Regions:
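Extreme N-terminal starter segment of soluble prokaryotic enzymes
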Residues: 2-4
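PIN/NYN-family metal-dependent endoribonuclease catalytic core
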Residues: 7, 17-19, 23-51
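A secondary-structure boundary/capping signal
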Residues: 8-9, 38-39, 108, 127
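Alpha-helix capping/helix-boundary segments
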Residues: 11-12, 42, 111-112
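Hydrophobic/aromatic ligand-binding patch that stacks against planar heteroaromatic rings
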Residues: 28, 66, 96, 117
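Extended, non-globular alpha-helical segments
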Residues: 40-67, 134-139
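Active-site neighborhoods of divalent-metal-dependent phosphate/nucleic-acid chemistry enzymes
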Residues: 72-105, 110, 114
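Acidic, PIN/NYN-like endoribonuclease modules and their adjacent C-terminal/linker elements
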Residues: 110-139
Length: 139
């Protein structure tokens, strides 16, 4: 069974360019080296932020590639954990990770540090560099 992962939007964005040191994150997803877990809310944020930071066309292509991938798991979380108070918008990633029983969330966002202090839900958060090291060690 593949490792289930939730990617924060900025980590996904940082991995899209083939010239990026983080490109392996996107490439390994496309090659099925892990399963990307997403919800409709997460896909909407991917679309919005990538369109804003890159172009609407790139955003559409990225979201289409995710939706059509064999290595994506669509999660419909019927509950909200409200684990992050500093930025409630980040809770969609926590809810998705918890519902998917994901190994971790990949994020550079310090708001996710709040998860370290919670007894429940237990959701591991990796920084992008740590996730890259994880991918390298799996080879």
């Amino acid at each position: 069974m593949q490792t289930r992962v939730v990617l924060d939007t900025n980590c996904l964005l940082a991995s899209l360019s083939s010239k990026s040191e983080n490109f392996r994150v996107w490439k390994d997803f496309q090659e099925g080296k892990y399963t990307l877990c997403v919800s409709n809310e997460i896909l909407e944020e991917y679309q919005e932020i990538i369109a804003e930071k890159a172009t609407p066309n790139i955003a559409q292509n990225v979201v289409r590639a995710i939706v059509e991938s064999d290595y994506v798991e669509f999660i419909d979380s019927h509950f909200h954990l409200y684990a992050i108070f500093a930025d409630p918008d980040d809770n969609k990633f926590v809810d998705c990770a918890f519902a998917a029983n994901a190994a971790f969330i990949v994020s550079e966002d310090s708001h996710f540090d709040a998860l370290k202090t919670l007894a429940f839900p237990k959701v591991l958060v990796l920084k992008l560099k740590a996730f890259l090291k994880y991918l390298e060690n799996r080879d």
